[in-house]
Amino acid sequence: MAVSNTTKALKDIMRIDAGINGDAQYIEQITWMLFLKAFDFKEQIWEETDESYYPVVPQEYRWSVWADDAEGVTGDLLLEHVTAMFRALRNLDTSKEEDPKRRKWLVNSVLEDVNNFMKSGTELRKVINKINEDINFYEVKGSHLFNGIYEGMLKDLQSAGKAGEFYTPRPVTRFVVRHIVPKLGESIFDPACGTGGFLTSVINYFEDNDAVTSVDDYSTLQNTIRGIEKKPFPYLLCITNLLAHGIDVPDVRRANALARHTSEYTAKEKVDIIVTNPPFGGAENKVISQSVSAELRNTETADLFLVHIMALLKDGGRCGLVLPDGFLFGTGVKSAIKKKLLEECDLHTIIRLPKSVFAPYTSINTNLLFFTKGRPTKGVWFYRLEMPEGYKHFSKTKPMQDSHFKPVEDWWGKLEGGAWKGRAESDVSQYVPVEDIIAGDYNLDLCGFPHETVEILPPDEFIAKYLNEKAAISARIENILGQITAAMNQEGV
């Protein structure tokens, strides 16, 4: 069964249901079912390999008990069963005594804010049966199909309104991971992990390079990948994604990674590698903005993440992240953050990405920054990745591909003795000494695109782009008004 056939069949069934409204709800609905199916498969393995293992999920709510039978409970009785199941799984005892391996905690936290949107128990049974028909984890092809279906759903997020913020195109995550060059045993962290794209790209990188070949290697991998995600929907997606990639109990917390002050991080919490695409265009409240020192304080989410990332890296730690153009040319507090970055880290490479990499979610220009903590920057290499031949812009139907990174792959070179060998300046690449950057008031908007072209999008993509940008502006206005109202209330106005 082809991935596209399964995905289409599931969408066709759910489209009939009155409770499903749009791709984001379709994806959430499918994902909680895939999570329960995947977790039940894990529990069956644990039961087979550990005689003392006792299932986390109560017997009547295990997928293999209530969902596997194609002629099983359906209609209103099925809806009632799912409601009772959610209630029970959200109230599992997650104390250390009862849950030493944090498996109950995982189920509880994943399902805490998840919804069953479907109104028809009959249609829900059809969806469940289709999932069971096409995905069998005991077959290799079944696992591959699961990953294919899941990755396809995550890709759909990019055009699913505001939910697009949680998805980073996989060619981007794979490129960043390849050039961070993680080693098995290094601690790897994504503080804004969304659907888990960077973390699963790390796992795939290790597998592609035959780095995980023994039980001990597998255990090391399990214990070195970590993440944080603030919102429940992408958290569900991330956990299920990591389960599908072989992580038994993903070490991903639901929290705001910016909530603690940067001075509070302990040596034990610091990591070797951070790969991330922090939210940009958003604003944090005043309390969160105070989690960094005064001279670096503002409400721009991406700026705050960068300050936290610098604090979380060990000396010698490496980072690859996505940041918008606004950070590169920004002044004031942004200049202060860039000054700190250049003084405390070796910002060795900035890749200027084409404008529509994240289309249709956003048309904001983005960049990939690579740096190492613990030594100051001597100079920065810039590379402008041009739109590939035959493309005016990327879109849902013509997305960015891994092959589009070939020009920068060929240029990248090799770091030897603290210097890059094989790199050369050209009409798309430039080396800028740090003294010139300082003299330019820390402006990093260099080696940019010389000509702006007007994008003429198809009507459906133009409307989606307009609605997304309108929603983003409205959210920022609401955030600012909320801060003003809070300030007025504090002063008794």
Please provide the spans of the model-predicted regions.
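A generic structural signal for well-ordered coil/turn residues at beta-strand boundaries
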Residues: 270, 274, 364-365, 376-379, ...
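Short beta-alpha connecting loops at secondary-structure transitions
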Residues: 223-226, 288-294, 352-354, 390-397
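Conserved Class I SAM-dependent methyltransferase catalytic core
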Residues: 22, 232-235, 298-371
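Helical mechanochemical/support elements of P-loop NTPase systems and associated helical scaffolds
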Residues: 6, 22-26, 123, 145, ...
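C-terminal, active-site-flanking charged/polar segments
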Residues: 346-347, 359-410
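Conserved S-adenosyl-L-methionine
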Residues: 165-276, 281-283, 292, 299, ...
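Non-catalytic, mostly N-terminal accessory regions of nucleic-acid modification and defense proteins
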Residues: 1-184, 253-260, 352-356, 378-386, ...
